[in-house]
Amino acid sequence: RNLCRIVSASFMEDSYYRRPRIDRDLLEQYHEGLICCSACLGGELPQKIMEGMSAMGGENGNINSENTFQAAEETIEWYKNLFGEDYYIEIQRHQTTKPGADQHVYQVQREVNPVLVELAKKHGVRVVATNDVHFVEEEHAEAHDHLVCVSTNHFIDDENRMHYTKQEWLKSPQEMEEIFSDIPEALENTQEIVDKVEVYDIDSGPIMPKFPIPEEFGTEESCRQTFTEQDL
């Protein structure tokens, strides 16, 4: 229920160029019963880490600078205080050799992931292995690449257009185990999240509006007999 409230509010209250978004105030209001993960490289926590790395480069590579990842640590503590044991730090590995795929993402993941793991241990937050999903099967990567071109108004042969890693399919447990074989606890924590999720059925049947039948039409059955299927 709280998730539905957040999603609805994200579209209505403060959308950005018709893109849904929320702020921390809304999370504080509707966080009960939700599980929160730190997201991909575009998430708040990885972005703070990358900002720290950039500043670190400006400090002549002083990796031991006390404030290098202060903003990232403050971010972790905020979410941990709000969600408790339902807050997880994500790591992803989108290594790719596919032609035309983005190679840079994995390079950044290799730099950011060790920091994520280190900060997770420092703050007592569990790490979870995840994979961005934009299409279902591996062979759908090329179709997705074409759709990205359509949505961004670029040609396939445009070198400066948006590229994905072509690793964003719904990977099997076996594929994820191979990718994260060196961090088995991250895979175990994925199952932990699954066990936490409440099982429920989604009613996929049509939900029709209720139209009151005027008294002069009698019952619903008599109303139905008055008109043919074509009339209706």
Where are these regions (language model features)?
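Phosphodiester-processing cores and adjacent nucleic acid-binding clamps
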Residues: 1-232
